[in-house]
UniProtKB/Swiss-Prot annotation:
Entry keyword set: Ribonucleoprotein, Ribosomal protein
Provenance organism: Mesoplasma florum (strain ATCC 33453 / NBRC 100688 / NCTC 11704 / L1)
Positions of region (Disordered): 1-43
Family: Belongs to the bacterial ribosomal protein bL35 family.
Protein name per UniProt: Large ribosomal subunit protein bL35
Taxonomy of the source species: Bacteria, Bacillati, Mycoplasmatota, Mollicutes, Entomoplasmatales
One Pfam family from the record: Ribosomal_L35p
Paired cysteines (S-S): none
One GO CC term on file: cytosolic large ribosomal subunit
Length: 64
C-alpha cells in the first residue's frame, strides 16, 4: 500500500510544537486592514494554538 500523503496546503499553515500542540497564524490580517484599529492589527500578528476540538482532525490531515 502506498504511503499516506499529508495535505500540503495545511502543512504550510501549521507548525507542530514539541508538546504536540499545533501553532497557526490568525486570519483577517492580510488586506482591508484600514478599518481595524492598531490594537486589533497588532494582536492579529501573533500566532495562536489550534483549538483542542480541531486538533484530532488536523493531525489526521497532517499524518502526525
Amino acid at each position: 500500500m502506498p504511503k499516506m500523503k499529508s495535505k500540503k496546503s495545511l502543512a504550510k499553515r501549521v507548525i507542530a510544537k514539541k508538546n504536540g500542540t499545533l501553532k497557526r497564524g490568525k486570519a483577517y490580517r492580510s488586506h482591508r486592514a484600514t478599518g481595524k484599529t492598531t490594537k486589533q492589527k497588532r494582536h492579529l500578528e501573533k500566532a495562536t494554538i489550534v483549538h483542542v476540538t480541531d486538533m484530532k482532525r488536523i493531525k489526521g490531515l497532517l499524518q502526525k
